[in-house]
Amino acid sequence: MSNQETVLQQNIRLALGQHSDLRLFRNETGKLPDPRTGRWVQFGLAKGSSDLIGFKTVKITPEMIGQEVAQFVSIEIKTERGKLTNVQQNWLQKVKSSGGIVGVARTVKDALQILKV
């Protein structure tokens, strides 16, 4: 990312951060070597994914009836004994309170039930 693009992204994030109905996060993608193992580790959502990822709370109004809108989904995967951290609980609560679909999946069936598919 060029210096100009970095400055622009910072300015956009500051401006958008003033809106309580928005939650956006910087999404850097790439690969780096793990300093412990030397193996390459990918990070970020996916190659080609956008710089800012998040959600906007939208109130559904009568004129929107029949339209399709995307809904943010956040599923935390845990083993049978795995426990959510406070940070993970806070994340899920914020997404849920903003209208997203959230849940903890310990099995494939859990994930399917969370998404009602």
Question: Predicted segments — roles?
Answer:
Residues 1-117:
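Catalytic phosphate/metal-binding cores of nucleic-acid and nucleotide-processing enzymes, i.e., regions
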